[in-house]
């Protein structure tokens, strides 16, 4: 019976001491993995940041193109009176003094070029 107790005690002591060593090794491995994981996360974060900056630059570029009056504002059609000093005739039209009809109105009209 004593030999069983001694054997059990010996196995218990060995298990505890080896378990402590394994625990320390596991802790070291976990620290290494977390450091590698952090470096991977930093890399992924930088990559995502670059992509977001590129996307933001494209969006700002599109906004600036729209703000440069790329679209034509409301314009005056053909045969409609216009202001000589501030003509707003549509593209392809010119603000001219009428030749025949409308002479009595003393106004300018949008005509084709």
UniProtKB/Swiss-Prot annotation:
UniProt propeptide residues: 22-74
Organism superkingdom: Eukaryota
GO terms assigned for molecular function: sodium channel inhibitor activity; toxin activity
Tissue: Expressed by the venom gland.
Keyword check for Secreted: yes
Residue span of region Disordered: 61-83
This protein's record includes keyword Signal: yes
Disulfide pattern: 75-90, 82-95, 89-110
Subcellular location, record wording: Secreted
InterPro entries recorded: Toxin_22
Gene Ontology CC terms: extracellular region
Alphabetized UniProt keyword annotations: Disulfide bond, Ion channel impairing toxin, Knottin, Secreted, Signal, Toxin
Physiological role: Probable ion channel inhibitor.
Family: Belongs to the neurotoxin 14 (magi-1) family. 01 (HNTX-16) subfamily.
Name of the protein described by the UniProt record: U11-theraphotoxin-Hhn1a
